[in-house]
From Swiss-Prot:
Name this polypeptide is given: Precursor of CEP9
PANTHER family noted in UniProt: PRECURSOR OF CEP10-RELATED, PRECURSOR OF CEP5
The keyword Secreted appears for this protein: yes
Swiss-Prot/TrEMBL keywords: Apoplast, Developmental protein, Hormone, Hydroxylation, Secreted, Signal
One Gene Ontology term, aspect cellular component: apoplast
Expression induction: Induced by nitrogen (N) and potassium (K), but repressed by auxin. Repressed in shoots in response to ammonium chloride NH(4)Cl and osmotic stress (e.g. mannitol). Triggered by nitrogen depletion.
Oxidoreductase found in the keyword field: no
Species whose genome carries this gene: Arabidopsis thaliana (Mouse-ear cress)
């Protein structure tokens, strides 16, 4: 008997809930500021709205004319505010604020170009002729100029940056680095000393025995008896004991 009662109760409850609709339409609430508020529904809440005028999530789009705002983002003409130092200031506008200006004369962002003559400044970066200042030791000094400041100079005689070449005869020094003939100095103890020369100073020598720069190689480095080296730059004498 108890089982029958439970079964009948379950059937009645199922019939009641079976007739209840699964989805319900949105229930209109209170209308505020010409906007229809809905608790839930199938309205297209996220359709595009005019800039700065979004009704918010859950609000009906209403009668917003989106097409009327399609040109809101086009450039608008600048509104002139105040004129300072022959420059027209604009709050906003479609003027060419970033046009090229003469060097050192930028009107700044948001300023109209004014009457800047860019064409007259096109040659500002050309070389200007140097202004002669003072002559020292036969060298002409210039503050700036288009002279050939970095032309080759004679060895040990560089005029420095900004100095004119002067009368340096570069062609006359073309052989300065050619080998010069050796100059014999004083002869001491039967040994010949040389200041410089065109000899092959850097010929291969035995390890640890370099004659040094400016010394004639001669036969200085013939094998000698232990403890009897003639020294660097000294010519060897043929007084070695013969084997």
């Amino acid at each position: 008997m108890k089982l029958l009662s439970i079964t009948l109760t379950s059937i009645v409850i199922s019939m009641v809930f079976y007739q209840t609709p699964i989805t319900t339409e949105a229930r209109s609430l209170r209308k505020t500021n010409d906007q229809d508020h809905f608790k839930a529904g199938f309205t297209d809440d996220f359709v595009p709205t005019s800039p700065g005028n979004s009704p918010g999530v859950g609000h009906k789009k209403g009668n917003v004319n989106v097409e009327g705002f399609q040109d809101d983002f086009k450039p608008t003409e600048g509104r002139k505010l105040l004129k300072t130092n022959v420059q027209d200031h604009f709050k906003t506008g479609s003027t060419d604020d970033f046009a090229p200006t003469s060097p050192g004369h930028s009107p700044g962002v948001g300023h109209k170009k004014g009457n800047v003559n860019v064409e007259s400044s096109e040659d500002d970066f050309k070389h200007k002729e140097g202004r002669k200042l003072q002559q020292t030791n036969g060298q002409n000094h210039f503050k700036t100029g288009s002279t050939d400041d970095f032309a080759p100079t004679s060895p040990g005689n560089s005029p420095g940056i900004g100095h004119k070449k002067g009368h340096a005869n570069v062609k006359g020094f073309k052989d300065d680095f050619a080998p010069t003939e050796e100059i014999r100095l004083q002869k001491m103890n039967g040994q010949d000393h040389f200041k410089t020369g065109s000899t092959d100073d850097f010929a291969p020598t035995t390890p640890g025995n370099s004659p040094g720069m400016g010394h004639k190689k001669g036969d200085d480095f013939k094998p000698t008896t232990p403890g009897h080296s003639p020294g660097v730059g000294h010519a060897v004498k043929n007084d070695e004991p013969k084997a």
